A protein has these predicted regions:
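N-terminal Sec-pathway targeting helices
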Residues: 1-9
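Hydrophobic h-region of N-terminal signal peptides that target proteins for export
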Residues: 10-20
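Catalytic glycan-binding domains that act on GlcNAc-containing polysaccharides
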Residues: 20-152
Length: 152
């Protein structure tokens, strides 16, 4: 077996092992305090059929649902919104108030997800579009596009 493949398999199984130790989104380990916001804004920006747990899982991945989280690059709040991104989102959505208030942080994160989601072709499967959306949220839309071109 080539070295790259065996290294990839080791990484895959290590990731699987770690993931099996992380509590599920619905687990009581995670606070339910923000669930109404995840429900409300996922429906507002994605429609009633969307499973709001996508966005709670994103909040867990971004900050562990810590409302006062700040990253080394100054991303803020539960959804780890960059200040410049929040400023741009406020121009398009005047209801957004303060990035550090959980309600508006979650609203901004899901609103941004909806913008990214719409950038991916509609002929893609829903699951692929959501995965690309989540990847774009973290790495940037153009980064994901470049990675796709390299992988072809």
């Amino acid at each position: 077996m080539p070295r790259v493949v065996s290294t990839g398999l080791v990484f895959f199984f290590a990731t699987l092992l770690i993931a099996s130790e992380i509590p599920k989104v619905s687990d009581r380990h995670w606070t339910r305090k923000y669930d109404p916001y995840f429900r409300k804004y996922s429906k507002r920006f994605f429609g009633p059929a969307i499973d709001w747990h996508w966005f709670k899982a994103q909040g867990i991945a971004e900050s562990g649902l810590r409302e006062n989280a700040k990253s080394w690059v100054n991303a803020k709040g539960i959804m780890q919104i960059m200040p410049n991104t929040f400023t741009e989102l406020k121009k398009k959505n005047a209801q957004l108030k303060d990035v550090m208030i959980p309600r508006w942080n979650i609203c901004a994160g899901i609103y941004y997800d909806s913008i990214l989601f719409k950038k991916w072709e509609e002929d893609r499967k829903f699951l692929d579009r959501m995965r690309f959306t989540m990847g774009s949220y973290n790495a940037g839309f153009r980064t994901i596009l470049r990675a796709q071109k390299v992988s072809r």
